[in-house]
Amino acid sequence: MIGCSLLSNGQQISREELIALTPLWKGERFPDGRPKVPDSILDRMKLVTLEEAWAVLRNENYKHQYDGNWQTINPDSVLVGRAVTAIFVPGRPDIHRVIDSFGVRDKRVKSQNSWPIDLLVKRDVYVVNQFGAHEDGPTIGDNLGNSIYAKTGNGIVYDGAIRDINGLKE
C-alpha cells in the first residue's frame, strides 16, 4: 500500500495499480493485490543476517535501500514479515478534510492513521513514513501498537513519534 493516492481510494492504491507496480512477482497475491510471500520464506528470512540481506540487494542493484539508526524496542527479536507501507504527509486542513470525506464515502471508521492498520493481516510488518514528525502528527502508542500486534503478531518500522514505550515493550 502506498498512502495518499488521492485519485484512487483515499489512502490506498487499487489492486490493479499494485499489481502493475510489482510485475516481477509471480506467486500468490492477497485480495488487494499485495504479493503473498509464503510463510516458509518468511521463516527462512529470520535466519538471514543483515549483511547477507544487504549483499543480495546490492548485487541486484537495489541501491539506497538501507536506513540505520532506528530505535529498537525489543533488541532480542528479529522483525520479518510482509511490508504494508503508509506515508503520512505533513497535515493541511484543506487536504485533511477531503481525505476524511473519502473515508466517509468508503465507510472507514476512526481517524486516518488507523486506516492502513485495518488492512493488516498475520505476518505483516507495518512500515510508516511520518517524516520523523514529533509534533502535530500521528503517533504510535501502546493502543495502536497493541492493535497492530494483535492483527499481525509482528512489530512496526515507524519514522515518527513513538510514545508509551513501556506499553509497547509488553
Regions found by a protein language model. Give the residues of each.
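Short, flexible, solvent-exposed loop/turn segments with mixed acidic/basic and small polar residues
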Residues: 3, 34, 145
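Bacterial Sec-dependent N-terminal signal peptides
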Residues: 1-11
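Short hydrophobic/aromatic-rich motifs at helix boundaries and adjacent loops
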Residues: 1, 23-27, 115-118
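N-terminal pre-domain segments of enzymes
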Residues: 11-60
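Feature captures the catalytic cores and cofactor-binding loops of soluble hydro-lyases/lyases
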Residues: 50, 57-170
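Mixed-charge, polar/low-complexity N-terminal
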Residues: 10-11, 15-17, 22-24, 43, ...
